[in-house]
């Protein structure tokens, strides 16, 4: 004889359960931003933009001039993990080269 467990809901034969559609949100995006300082050479900033952000020389120069004139410039917009990785790579490279260049991420 089969026993029924107490407090366990029983389904009728032929009942079809509907699967609820999951609404996935796009990931949060972050801007990677270089901050101006009076010591890091402009050519080093251009090299960083080319090496870590795949910018051509002309675009890298324009971003570098924005950093110089306005105090900061956006290098690119990425998901959180990619942005954090780029910030760490740039900061480490600048530190190893003896430059005080700062790179931060901001919510886009």
Swiss-Prot record:
- Pfam families from the entry? ClpS
GO BP annotations of the record are:
protein catabolic process; proteolysis
Please state which protein family the record places this protein in.
Belongs to the ClpS family.
Q: Subunit details for this protein?
A: Binds to the N-terminal domain of the chaperone ClpA.
What NCBIfam families does UniProt report for this protein, alphabetically? PRK00033.1-5
Q: What is this protein called?
A: ATP-dependent Clp protease adapter protein ClpS
Q: What function is annotated for this protein?
A: Involved in the modulation of the specificity of the ClpAP-mediated ATP-dependent protein degradation.
Q: Which domain of life is it from?
A: Bacteria
What taxonomic ancestry is recorded?
A: Bacteria, Pseudomonadati, Pseudomonadota, Betaproteobacteria, Burkholderiales
């Amino acid at each position: 004889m089969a026993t029924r467990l107490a407090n366990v809901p029983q389904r009728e034969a032929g009942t079809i359960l509907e699967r609820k559609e999951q609404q996935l949100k796009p990931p949060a995006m972050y801007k990677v931003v270089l901050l101006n300082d009076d010591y890091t050479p402009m050519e080093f900033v251009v090299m960083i933009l080319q090496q870590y952000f795949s910018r051509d020389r002309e675009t890298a120069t324009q971003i570098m001039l924005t950093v110089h004139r306005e105090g900061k410039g956006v290098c690119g917009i990425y998901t959180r993990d990619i942005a954090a990785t780029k910030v760490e790579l740039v900061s480490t490279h600048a530190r190893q080269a003896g430059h005080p260049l700062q790179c931060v991420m901001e919510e886009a």
